[in-house]
């Protein structure tokens, strides 16, 4: 039986370079991915290198709050 809160939690990953570029100029959008993480194995914020269709390259996507 599981104790306390659920171990697996759904998180949203957002492109960090799109967020920085949207401040300077008009952006076409911000790339976001939805995934799950195990709270016991990775208690800190998740950062993964994923493909951003707006930047046309692989960039770092960081976890954001819901």
Curated annotation (Swiss-Prot):
Cross-referenced Pfam families: Ribosomal_L33 (PF00471)
Keyword Ribosomal protein appears in the UniProt entry: yes
Localization of this protein: Plastid, Chloroplast
GO BP annotations, alphabetical order: translation
InterPro entries linked: Ribosomal_bL33 (IPR001705), Ribosomal_bL33_CS (IPR018264), Ribosomal_bL33_sf (IPR038584), Ribosomal_zn-bd (IPR011332)
Gene Ontology CC: chloroplast; ribonucleoprotein complex; ribosome
GO molecular function, one term: structural constituent of ribosome
Keyword field: Chloroplast, Plastid, Ribonucleoprotein, Ribosomal protein
Record-stated family: Belongs to the bacterial ribosomal protein bL33 family.
Protein name, as recorded: Large ribosomal subunit protein bL33c
């Amino acid at each position: 039986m599981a104790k306390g809160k659920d171990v697996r939690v759904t998180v949203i990953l957002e492109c960090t370079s799109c967020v920085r570029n949207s401040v300077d100029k008009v952006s076409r959008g911000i790339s976001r991915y939805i995934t799950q993480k195990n709270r016991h194995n990775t208690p800190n914020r998740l950062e993964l290198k994923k493909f951003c269709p707006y930047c046309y390259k692989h960039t770092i996507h960081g976890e954001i709050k819901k």
